[in-house]
């Protein structure tokens, strides 16, 4: 039995993204999809004293209407220091900020990032390592890509020797489960409900934030606030 998920990369995604990674045996980063503006690929939210704040990685999009996520280039370098300053300003009082900063700050302040997909993968690897998630991370371009929205997903699963395809519930609107049935691959819709609240800075609990909020606030206890991280 092998569970596979196929998802586009996100910038410092929320905790449910990592719970899905922990739930499956192989997580295929689906960055052969077209880059879309005002999405989660290059931005996320953090919690501040003034409420939720977007932090966005600037990317080159002018004249690049059909570029894939993995072809998307980062525009400039100033963003990295600005993002770290925002994280430091809003989370330096968090209980585990210093611990997380030890391995996270160098990614922002010492490394050079020119490609959005590679940046997202770098952060994904670092966060998974901290959480103890050992799921295999693969790239969609390491496989042959079929035509057709559902057919491509099913074919990726088949090449990965999957017996089960796990997807977020929003894909119900376009995934044709019959295509998977023909390949004897089960489709499971991942449930993102039921996450425990944790102590945050700045007032009442806000669930729709980057996982960095969880890490800064609870540190090594973060897997306790995911459902599949230690199973």
UniProtKB/Swiss-Prot annotation:
Q: Which organism is it from?
A: Mycobacterium tuberculosis (strain ATCC 25618 / H37Rv)
Protein name (database record):
Uncharacterized protein Rv1507c
- Tell me which GO cellular component terms the UniProt record holds: plasma membrane
